[in-house]
């Protein structure tokens, strides 16, 4: 992520004392590239400021929302919180130092920062990318093993510790192979006195190319493969579950059409209500009545006392006092209200509505995951292609437009820090409610 001006001008910086002549021969004239972004410097300042503020505020909101409910956090939300933290580091370490080096054409932060800052830039970007891989792996595990025990907080801590360890290990060569080069010594101009460049000084081209290829594999190709495999598995699982429900609904419809008689024949074959209620009440109808709506009919007074209770002589007068769904059992002075039965048509309609909702959600998940993959691929591809091209054939980019092309590629990479809070936070149902509550609290305060 650091400004690799030296890659365009000198491919090999041998760390011996007799390299001044080689550097003078390798570097072009200072005026050839000095004014490459002069016409757009204010535009670049505004664009970098906008992207940096947007990325910083978005990731800060995600981090605050995750920390607000840290006692109820899941493994995915824990990883998303760490992703927001690493993206904040990317914004803080990459944007200001890169923009300053591009616009001022020199390194102004001292020799110690020349060794430290490229290392921190590389670690922050690499950790952010490795956390994306971890989120993809966790989602893949949840889809493939839904019945197994959920991942605990200890698994999240282990993943984060592994990610940061790998980040420090992979980027460890950068502090060693960076040095501060004086421009006066390099270009032989008195106007460039007291101006320095922070450049990579690898022992040979093979070391530099090997490091560039390793970063390409770890920071771009491997995450892209993991994201694609994980999200394809998620979409496939949702699609398989949806098709299974549709097939089961079609089978039920075929069984109903084949075995059930028509509504007209069923109405003709209906038995009278009183006869129906006199048949095996306990065996057939015990589940159709609600205990909450049971009521006891008043028993007639007088000579009927001490005898078996019977239904009043005029049951119509009693039934008129009850709800329309109530039934009177002959010979038993108790009334129950029948539970409403769901017809097969209503059940089918409910299942169809459920399938429609699942289809809508599956399309939403598919679009969101596809956009997530495309955002990562499009935002980081130009910068990695730029580094590979400048390592193998720097003549493809002219001296004057070198810094401008680099700024465009670098800004596209920085855009991922602005879009990650939206894709992983604001579109995440587990974090969306917390974000709304947090924004409301901030607005009220």
From Swiss-Prot:
Keyword presence, Methyltransferase: no
SMART domains linked: 7TM_GPCR_Srsx
Sorted UniProt keywords: Cell membrane, Disulfide bond, G-protein coupled receptor, Glycoprotein, Lipoprotein, Membrane, Palmitate, Receptor, Transducer, Transmembrane, Transmembrane helix
Lipidation, S-palmitoyl cysteine type: 441
GO BP annotations listed: cardiac left ventricle morphogenesis; chemical synaptic transmission; eating behavior; G protein-coupled receptor signaling pathway; generation of ovulation cycle rhythm; negative regulation of acute inflammatory response to antigenic stimulus; negative regulation of apoptotic process; negative regulation of glutamate secretion
Cited Pfam families: 7tm_1
PROSITE patterns, alphabetized: G_PROTEIN_RECEP_F1_2
Extracellular side: 1-42, 99-117, 178-208, 390-406
TM spans (from-to): 43-63, 78-98, 118-138, 157-177, 209-229, 369-389, 407-427
Topology class, membrane: Multi-pass membrane protein
Identification of the protein by name: Neuropeptide Y receptor type 5
């Amino acid at each position: 992520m650091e400004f690799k001006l030296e890659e365009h001008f000198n491919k090999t910086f041998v760390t011996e004392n007799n390299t001044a002549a080689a550097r003078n021969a390798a570097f072009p004239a200072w005026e050839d590239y000095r004014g490459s972004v002069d016409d757009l410097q204010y535009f670049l300042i505004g664009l970098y400021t906008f992207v940096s503020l947007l990325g910083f505020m978005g990731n800060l909101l995600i981090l605050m929302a995750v920390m607000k409910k840290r006692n109820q956090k899941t493994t995915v939300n824990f990883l998303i919180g760490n992703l927001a933290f690493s993206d904040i580091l990317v914004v803080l370490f990459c944007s200001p130092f890169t923009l300053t080096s591009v616009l001022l054409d020199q390194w102004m932060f001292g020799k110690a920062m020349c060794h430290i800052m490229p290392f921190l830039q590389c670690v922050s970007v690499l950790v952010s990318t490795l956390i994306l891989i971890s989120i993809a792996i966790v989602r893949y595990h949840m889809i493939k093993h839904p019945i197994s025990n959920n991942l605990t907080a200890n698994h999240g801590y282990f993943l984060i510790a592994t990610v940061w360890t790998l980040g420090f290990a992979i980027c460890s060569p950068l502090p060693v192979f960076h040095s501060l080069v004086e421009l006066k010594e390099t270009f032989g101009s008195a106007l460039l006195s007291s101006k320095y460049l922070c450049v990579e000084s690898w022992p040979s081209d093979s070391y530099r190319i090997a490091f560039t290829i390793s970063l390409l594999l770890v920071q771009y190709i491997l995450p892209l493969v993991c994201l694609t495999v994980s999200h394809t598995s998620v979409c496939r699982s949702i699609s398989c579950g949806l098709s299974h429900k549709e097939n089961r609904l079609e089978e039920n419809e075929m069984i109903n059409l084949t075995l059930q008689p028509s509504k007209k024949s069923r109405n003709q074959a209906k038995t009278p209500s009183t006869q129906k209620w006199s048949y095996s009440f306990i065996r057939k109808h015990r589940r159709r009545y609600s205990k909450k709506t049971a009521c006891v009919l008043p028993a007639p007074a007088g000579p009927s006392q001490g005898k078996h209770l019977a239904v009043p002589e005029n049951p119509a007068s009693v039934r008129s006092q009850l709800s329309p769904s109530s039934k009177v059992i002959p010979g038993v002075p108790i009334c129950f209200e029948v539970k409403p039965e769901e017809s097969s048509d209503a059940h089918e309609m409910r299942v169809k509505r459920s399938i429609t909702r699942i289809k809508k959600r599956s399309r939403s998940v598919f679009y969101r995951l596809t956009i997530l993959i495309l955002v990562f691929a499009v935002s980081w591809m130009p910068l990695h292609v730029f580094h590979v091209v400048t390592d193998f054939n720097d003549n493809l980019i002219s001296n004057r437009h070198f810094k401008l092309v680099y700024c465009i590629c670098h800004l596209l990479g920085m855009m991922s820090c602005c879009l990650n809070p939206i894709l992983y936070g604001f579109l995440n149902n587990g974090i969306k409610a917390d974000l709304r509550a947090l924004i409301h609290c901030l607005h009220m305060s």
